Amino acid sequence: MKIVIQRVKSASVSIDGKIKEKINQGFLLLVGVEDADSNFDLDYAVRKIAQMRIFSDEADKMNLSVQDIQGEILSISQFTLYAETKKGNRPSFSAAGKPDFAKAMYEKFNDSLAQIVPVKAGVFGADMQVELINDGPVTIILDTKEARKNA
């Protein structure tokens, strides 16, 4: 899994011009799945995201997690994180997970994360418009492939 984690003051996702979901302070996640992903990747990502301390404490040090601040998460499926751009000018997305597998993993990821932190989500495969107010900005890229190699 590749996940872009953005610390936000607020975020929303709209479909057909109507807001589907919105959150206040927390994380906007852009979530990509590849066919090699497994429950290991899912569990690793959930644990890392729930415990990642990138919110400032009273000393202005990044020391608080999304749980600590009672924040929320807006999760958006994003197969384009697996774009391959080596050849030509049009990206290839063949490295992205097959739609049925990716959808199941994405939904399981959201369900697992929602047991720890409030999670709202976009619609898998839909054409969505995402608005956010970055906080910092703080943007982290989590790639579970590295953890899988070392497991």
Curated annotation (Swiss-Prot):
Molecular-function GO terms, alphabetical: D-tyrosyl-tRNA(Tyr) deacylase activity; Gly-tRNA(Ala) deacylase activity; Ser(Gly)-tRNA(Ala) hydrolase activity; tRNA binding
Sequence motif Gly-cisPro motif, important for rejection of L-amino acids, residues: 136-137
Pfam families documented for this protein: Tyr_Deacylase
Entry's EC annotation: 3.1.1.96
Catalytic activity: glycyl-tRNA(Ala) + H2O = tRNA(Ala) + glycine + H(+); a D-aminoacyl-tRNA + H2O = a tRNA + a D-alpha-amino acid + H(+)
Principal location class: cytoplasm
Domain observations: A Gly-cisPro motif from one monomer fits into the active site of the other monomer to allow specific chiral rejection of L-amino acids.
The protein's name in its UniProt record: D-aminoacyl-tRNA deacylase
